[in-house]
């Protein structure tokens, strides 16, 4: 091939070949072409002279054609041909690139734009000529078109940025709403609380929320005075009684009668009460008397609805109270309670005062003192009878039963009891609602299991000097002439036997209904016949009231102060006692939001999602960040992230509390607890969900910005002096900005009730339904057919429009993957031997080994 070129044509060397290929690359550029099509192999870095000679041999036919083409071009003024077009495109594209770099900040590009790299060289022209371009040559190229779009887009971007900065600067004084702040505040007197009780293994009062008893958050908050849990004592007591006896009311009524109860002076001054007494079948009340009604079960009261309890003694937060013993009926002994004998301190007229009618004794400074007093009772069978061994199929074993000579209902169930201490009782001469006449006390007694008797507990009543005259008192002390339904002074001496009996019934007033509980059948179930004994099993912390007593100046026949300290019979009122036990628990809540200045956004933590489990953490570990008045507002914001990060720790504490309390609660009730708290958190959000979203605040945000027009309309101005750049406690800030919280509440209510956008949206939806209502009349199969046709047509249209771009994209991707770059496409004569396209793959010629190329 070299000999042919030498004979007929002038051989083209490496230098001339380099210039010819430069010209060829320039002429290949057209309106749609790239800026640098292909690579000049003679300008590849590190190319050697041997390589250049080899390239000349391979590309000699193409080089000859390029030289002939250049010689045929007539270079005249105003007609530069392809070369002029190439130069115009090159330098016009460079101008566009210069403008683009200018807008994005690369000003130095204009200074150094001639130093673009080793592959950029000016193409030498034999004769300089004036650069003149026709309108056709200066037509809009793709690069110029996209350059204009880039210019417009860049200008729009800068304009939007300017507008955004202006809006931001205009709202720098906006208000920020802090949702679910780590703070607890007292509830209002008018707020409604929802509570439940919890007692281990107690079906009548068992609630999953009671697992929070041992989960308390130690905190240094100091809360202002607010309503205590004792304010709801009457409601709680009534509900507790209904819970304790709810399954008993489903049984049949045993007896019913009407009765009139007289007051202290007969029926004068309308002091008589007409009551309807109902005696239910009492067998189902058997366990209730021994547990709930006598206060033998530890009961914890738990709050729901997102509210918590603050123990003012221990300075702790919890969902439930400490275990309490709440006797539901009047009982001689009670748990660790106190009584406000100064009646002026009790404002609730529904709570009976401590004291009775017609007394001159005035008790004050009462305190509860525990005692180790014990009662011992023994029973001796007073009627003849025999023990009979019977076979019971339902017990699967033999048993002994006592068969008296008379019916058991006619047998007097009498016992003899004594006390280990001298006890002076201030007693009433009659029981509640005319139940029992005479002075009496009552206590619980436990009987151990023996050969003939089962284990059982009884309620025993001891009386003195039972008489028949209801108008006069049966005295048992030194007060001989006390008349009417008055208290008496009686003393039960230590180690002295007194006649007592099993209590076979009592009367209780529940709401407006007075119920008499008959225990005769229940007592018979315990096999009370025969000889047996029992011992009182009062808890160690039970005792009596020790009071200072002062007599009045009246000389009437009324009860005076006891000569010795002692137990005060009938002092305990279940409502008053429950209220006294709950006075130390203050009902608090976590605010749903608090209004703070925009300044908090400058030092707040990185935004976190307010997920449901995060809300659970905030409600249980408020103290981690020092909730309340113990830390400044700026410190609370910076430590808020730590509170959110410890939600797993809160769940671990819940599990640990469940394990300590009862192992069986770890599975199901733990899940129920978490579900319950999640429901509370969801309800708290859904209550104002629509309004908060209208304000641009969703459930995933803790800090939400109020639109400026709203807080200006409602005159929500902050006192920056009080805020003091966050150097104020959250508790103080909340108390001094309650008006802001109220105004924000008004905003929410206005949005919820009078939402204009919501009404417009509904109207638009209705209009759209009117216009598009005809679609509903089209049969279902026609709808499917029409939808299929529209879908196919849309797909074909997209395919036609996007097919060229898709093919070009696939071609470019394949070239990139294979690593090929097209250098030249030489024209081959028909007579000449077929020559393959010269390609280079990664710097190597196709079809040649690496050794041959070297």
UniProtKB/Swiss-Prot annotation:
Region: Immunosuppression, residue numbers: 660-678
Extracellular face residues: 1-783
GO molecular function terms noted in the UniProt entry: structural molecule activity
Ranges per topology, Cytoplasmic: 805-854
Transmembrane segments: 784-804
Keywords, in A-Z order: Cleavage on pair of basic residues, Coiled coil, Disulfide bond, Glycoprotein, Host cell membrane, Host membrane, Host-virus interaction, Membrane, Transmembrane, Transmembrane helix, Viral attachment to host cell, Viral envelope protein, Virion, Virus entry into host cell
One cellular component (GO) term of this entry: host cell plasma membrane
Pfam families recorded: Env-gp36
Superkingdom to which the source organism belongs: Viruses
Residues marked Cleavage (site): 609-610
Segments for region (Fusion peptide): 614-634
Keyword Lipoprotein among UniProt keywords: no
Family annotation (CDD domains): HIV-1-like_HR1-HR2 (cd09909)
Coiled-coil parts of chain: 641-691, 734-770
Annotated glycosylation sites: 220, 258, 269, 274, 298, 330, 336, 342, 418, 422, 448, 469, 481, 499, 518, 531, 548, 551, 715, 719, 727, 735
Post-translational modification as stated in the protein's UniProt record: Specific enzymatic cleavages in vivo yield mature proteins. Envelope glycoproteins are synthesized as an inactive precursor that is N-glycosylated and processed likely by host cell furin or by a furin-like protease in the Golgi to yield the mature SU and TM proteins. The cleavage site between SU and TM requires the minimal sequence [KR]-X-[KR]-R.
One GO BP: symbiont entry into host cell
Assembly with partners or alone: The mature envelope protein (Env) consists of a trimer of SU-TM heterodimers attached by non-covalent interactions or by a labile interchain disulfide bond.
Protein's job: The surface protein (SU) attaches the virus to the host cell by binding to its receptor. This interaction triggers the refolding of the transmembrane protein (TM) and is thought to activate its fusogenic potential by unmasking its fusion peptide. Fusion occurs at the host cell plasma membrane. The transmembrane protein (TM) acts as a class I viral fusion protein. Under the current model, the protein has at least 3 conformational states: pre-fusion native state, pre-hairpin intermediate state, and post-fusion hairpin state. During viral and target cell membrane fusion, the coiled coil regions (heptad repeats) assume a trimer-of-hairpins structure, positioning the fusion peptide in close proximity to the C-terminal region of the ectodomain. The formation of this structure appears to drive apposition and subsequent fusion of viral and target cell membranes.
Protein name, entry field: Envelope glycoprotein gp150
Native species: Feline immunodeficiency virus (strain San Diego)
């Amino acid at each position: 091939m070299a000999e042919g070129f030498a004979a007929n044509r002038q051989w083209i060397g490496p230098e001339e070949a380099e210039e010819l290929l430069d010209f060829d690359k320039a002429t290949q550029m057209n309106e749609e072409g790239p800026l640098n099509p292909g690579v000049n192999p003679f300008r590849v870095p590190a190319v050697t002279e041997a390589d250049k000679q080899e390239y000349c041999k391979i590309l000699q036919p193409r080089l000859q054609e390029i030289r002939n083409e250049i010689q045929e071009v007539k270079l005249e003024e105003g007609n530069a041909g392809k070369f002029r077009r190439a130069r115009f495109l090159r330098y016009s594209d460079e101008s566009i690139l210069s403008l683009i770099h200018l807008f994005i900040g690369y000003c130095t590009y204009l200074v150094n734009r001639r130093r673009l790299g080793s592959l950029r060289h000016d193409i030498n022209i034999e004769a300089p000529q004036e650069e003149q371009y026709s309108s056709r040559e200066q037509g809009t190229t793709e690069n110029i078109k996209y350059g204009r779009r880039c210019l417009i887009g860049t200008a729009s971007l800068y304009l939007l940025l300017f507008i955004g900065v202006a809006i931001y600067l205009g709202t720098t004084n906006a208000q920020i709403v802090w949702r679910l702040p780590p703070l607890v505040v007292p509830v209002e007197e008018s707020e409604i609380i929802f509570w439940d009780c919890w007692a281990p293994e107690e079906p009548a009062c068992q609630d999953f929320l009671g697992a929070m008893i041992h989960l308390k958050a130690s905190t240094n908050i100091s809360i202002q005075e607010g309503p205590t849990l004792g304010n709801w004592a009457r409601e709680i007591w009534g509900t507790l009684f209904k819970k304790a006896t709810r399954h008993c009311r489903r049984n049949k009524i045993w007896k019913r009668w009407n009765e009139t109860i007289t007051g202290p002076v007969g029926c004068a001054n309308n002091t008589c009460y007409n009551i309807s007494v109902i005696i239910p079948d009492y067998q189902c009340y058997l366990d209730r008397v021994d547990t709930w009604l006598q206060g033998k079960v530890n009961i914890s009261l738990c709050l729901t609805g997102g509210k918590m309890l603050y123990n003012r003694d221990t300075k702790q937060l919890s969902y439930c109270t400490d275990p309490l013993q709440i006797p539901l009926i009047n009982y001689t002994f009670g748990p660790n309670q106190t009584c406000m004998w100064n009646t002026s301190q009790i404002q609730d007229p529904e709570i009976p005062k401590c004291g009775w009618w017609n007394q001159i004794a005035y008790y004050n400074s009462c305190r509860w003192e525990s005692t180790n007093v014990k009662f011992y009772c023994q029973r001796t069978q007073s009627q003849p009878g025999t023990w009979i061994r019977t076979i019971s199929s339902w017990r699967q074993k033999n048993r002994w039963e006592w068969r008296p000579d008379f019916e058991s209902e006619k047998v007097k169930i009498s016992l003899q009891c004594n006390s280990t201490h001298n006890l002076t009782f201030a007693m009433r001469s009659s029981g509640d609602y005319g139940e029992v006449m005479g002075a009496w006390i009552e206590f619980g007694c436990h009987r151990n299991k023996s050969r003939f008797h089962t284990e059982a507990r009884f309620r025993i009543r001891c009386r003195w000097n039972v008489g028949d005259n209801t108008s006069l008192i049966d005295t048992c002390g030194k007060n001989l002439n006390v008349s009417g339904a008055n208290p008496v002074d009686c003393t039960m001496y230590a180690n002295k036997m007194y006649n007592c009996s099993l209590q076979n019934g009592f009367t209780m007033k529940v709401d407006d209904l007075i119920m008499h509980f008959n225990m005769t059948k229940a007592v018979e179930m315990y096999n009370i016949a025969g000889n047996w004994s029992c011992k009182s099993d009062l808890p160690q912390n039970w005792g009596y009231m020790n009071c200072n007593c002062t007599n009045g100046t009246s000389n009437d026949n009324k009860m005076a102060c006891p000569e010795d300290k002692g137990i005060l019979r009938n002092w305990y009122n279940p409502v008053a006692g429950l209220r006294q036990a709950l006075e130390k628990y203050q009902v608090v809540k976590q605010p749903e939001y608090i209004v703070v200045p925009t300044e908090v956004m400058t030092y707040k933590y990185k935004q976190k999602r307010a997920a449901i489990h995060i809300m659970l953490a905030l409600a249980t570990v408020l103290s981690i960040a020092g909730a309340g008045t113990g830390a400044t507002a700026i410190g609370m914001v910076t430590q808020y992230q730590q509170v959110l990060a410890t939600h797993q720790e809160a769940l671990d504490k819940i599990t640990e509390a469940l394990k300590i309390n009862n192992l069986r609660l770890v599975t199901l009730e733990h899940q129920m607890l978490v579900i319950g708290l999640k429901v509370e958190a969801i309800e708290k959000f859904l209550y104002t969900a629509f309004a908060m979203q209208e304000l641009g605040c969703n459930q995933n945000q803790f800090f939400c910005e109020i639109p400026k027009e709203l807080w200006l309309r409602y005159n929500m101005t902050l006192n920056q002096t009080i805020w003091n750049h966050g150097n104020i406690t959250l508790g103080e800030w909340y108390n001094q900005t309650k008006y802001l919280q109220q105004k924000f509440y008004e905003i929410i209510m206005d949005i919820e009730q009078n939402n204009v956008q919501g009404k417009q949206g509904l109207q638009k939806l209705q209009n759209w339904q009117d216009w598009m209502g005809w679609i509903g009349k089209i049969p279902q199969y026609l709808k499917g057919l029409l939808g299929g046709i529209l879908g196919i047509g849309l797909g074909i249209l997209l395919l036609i429009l996007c097919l060229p771009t898709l093919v070009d994209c696939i071609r470019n991707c394949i070239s990139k993957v294979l690593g090929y770059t097209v250098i030249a496409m030489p024209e081959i004569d028909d007579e000449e031997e077929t020559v393959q396209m010269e390609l280079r793959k990664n710097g190597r010629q196709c079809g040649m080994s690496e050794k041959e190329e070297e």
